[in-house]
Amino acid sequence: MSLPIKFRAIFLIFGIVAIALTSGALAYQASLIPASRLINPDELVKILQSPRSEKPLMIQVGSHVLYTQAHIPGSEYIGPASSETGLQSLRKRVESLPRNKFIVLYCGCCPWSHCPNVKPADDALHAMGFTNVKILYIADNFGADWVEKGYPVGKGD
């Protein structure tokens, strides 16, 4: 499944903006997240398709525009975790959950090493005591690493 050219352009623009905004902001780079906390797209799809697997709460922590264009079905949008508003939304969404709840965070706005959203979201959940958090490893962007690989896609809010 090939992504329409306008979506590719939007992913590229958001990637460039994210890189520009986060250059030098090493504390928020996804590359600082330990490999043990990552999950690959194929692993997540197997979990979602298995009738016996515990289904995670999936939270998109990036741009609303990207979420409405394409997201993982069943995932929830809470806002960019690079902003305090997004982090507050994340905390509010999970505050009543058991601390061992299986949660998957993802963004996909730009190349992994420059993502401004997944590291703050991961840090916030771990600071709250969550112990079963995984970050979806998206090497380039959501379009290339999820949509174009034919994984399930939802659209709209």
Residue ranges and their predicted role:
Residues 35-50:
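A short, well-structured juxtamembrane/interface segment
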Residues 49-53, 96-99:
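Flexible, charged surface loops at secondary-structure boundaries
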